[in-house]
Amino acid sequence: MADNVPQIFDRKRLARNRTRAAGLTRNFGTHDFLLRHVGNELRDRIAGVARKFLTGLCLGSSGGIIEAMNSEQPDEGHIVTLYHADLSAYLVPDNGRGLVCDEERLPFAEASFDLVVALWGLHHVNDLPGALIQIRQILKPDGFFLA
């Protein structure tokens, strides 16, 4: 991220708010209609890609919706290994594939992922062009980005 980018959003406050909200809504129950809708849209879009994704990254909380969608996918559009990154530790799984990090400073090596999905987070990024550049860098040359 460039040093001269105006800091419109307070990223530390956003992390606190996401953690608080995650604690209040650990089990969405019948209130996950928006997540399910986004998951269905995501499933349809990824299913249209005629390939299997060996490594995927979900930026922002998915509430488990991507895992549910992925278990229903045939070979095309299937994500073999899915990693999660979020500002809040409460929103990343504790299965060894979750990382607490800021979308503005991605800690991944270049060409690490076949697929990057950004849910519920890029609208709060101060340097959107910088974040998109970083996402492009962590994608493999034929990688797929969906936001």
Identify the role of each PLM range:
Residues 51, 126, 140:
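Short conserved AdoMet
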Residues 1, 6, 26, 79, ...:
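Short, functionally important structural connectors and interaction interfaces within domains
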Residues 120-123:
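Short catalytic micro-motifs in class I SAM-dependent methyltransferases
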Residues 1-54:
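Class I SAM-dependent methyltransferase Rossmann-like catalytic core
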Residues 43-115, 129-133:
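Class I SAM-dependent methyltransferase SAM/SAH-binding core
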Residues 129-144:
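A short glycine-rich, Lys/Arg-flanked "PGG" loop and its adjoining helix->strand segment in the class I
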Residues 10-15, 28, 77-89, 138:
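Soluble, non-transmembrane catalytic domains of enzymes that act on hydrophobic metabolites at membranes
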